[in-house]
From Swiss-Prot:
It is found in: Cell membrane. This is Uncharacterized membrane protein bbp_130. Coiled coil: none annotated. Disulfide bonds: none annotated. The chain crosses the membrane at residues 5-25, 29-49, 53-73, 146-166, 180-200, 216-236. It is a multi-pass membrane protein.
Length: 257
């Protein structure tokens, strides 16, 4: 699938923008998004931005439109066809996920609508469940729009860096020490974010679960991983390779029209 997708989008910029619209729309569409490898497809599109084939801002705007269309249609479907949706075989097999989304939406609607967009399994479900719960448009629309604005560039980012790296291999291929530091910083920061999410889930999940690590130790690991990752990231800011990457990234953002 990814090979065919890459072949299609490299044929024309118009095709690429059309695929940004389709991918972001289907990723956000109720239930359909569960079956798409969103991070893979968005990273491929981000690679085209990184190597200069596709402009950043048009792709971002098209991505926002696709996200909003998918979310708002999902919200309408949840509101209009609640009874039909609850009888779907797919949802009956995923009652645990649906119940968790329902509980968090009931207690933390704005936070769940915003953060739910960035979590793969919940992205195509949260707007639909909002409609099913009759959550008001006033509550739904602001965090939804904010999530739709932030989601495309965040998911483009891995591909953008990959595109820059592929197009400029001679500028960093020998700097192995920098690559190890950079990778370690990214992994530690992502670990910290993951632990923060796990800690948040513990405080919001009312069900009883086996706890293999105490909250104190979890907070300690969270603090250490984030502190170490941020410290390494600050330390390598003066590295010539990172300076080069920043210049290329800035050029992509400034020159895009």
């Amino acid at each position: 699938m990814e090979t065919w997708f890459l072949y299609f989008i490299t044929k024309s910029i118009s095709y690429a923008l059309f695929m940004v619209l389709i991918v972001t729309f289907l990723e956000s569409l109720a239930l359909v998004g569960l079956f798409l490898p969103g991070i893979v497809l968005m990273s491929i599109l981000g690679t085209l931005i990184g190597n200069g084939t596709l402009s950043f801002y048009p792709a971002w705007i098209v991505g926002i439109i696709g996200c909003m269309c998918g979310d708002w249609i999902s919200y309408y479907c949840g509101f209009k066809f609640k009874k039909c949706i609850t009888n779907l075989h797919l949802l009956k097999n995923n009652n645990v996920v649906l119940d968790k989304i329902t509980n968090t939406l009931t207690n933390y609607p704005i936070t769940t609508i915003l953060l739910g967009r960035f979590i793969g399994p919940t992205r195509p479900l949260v707007p639909m469940v909002c409609g099913m719960l009759n959550i008001s448009l006033k509550t739904f629309i602001i965090p939804n729009i904010l999530g739709c604005i932030l989601w495309p560039p965040i998911y483009f980012l891995p591909g953008i860096f990959t595109g820059i790296a592929i197009s400029n291999t001679t500028n960093y291929s020998e700097n192995t020490y920098f690559k190890i530091q950079f990778l370690a910083a990214i992994l530690l920061i992502w670990l910290g974010i993951f632990l923060l999410w796990k800690l948040w889930k513990r405080y919001t999940d009312t069900g009883k679960k086996k706890i293999y690590i105490s909250n104190v130790n979890l907070c300690l690991l969270l603090t250490i991983s984030l502190s170490a990752g941020i410290t390494i990231m600050i330390y390598i800011q003066s590295n010539s390779t990172l300076i080069f990457f920043r210049k290329i990234l800035w050029k992509i953002l400034i020159s895009s029209q």
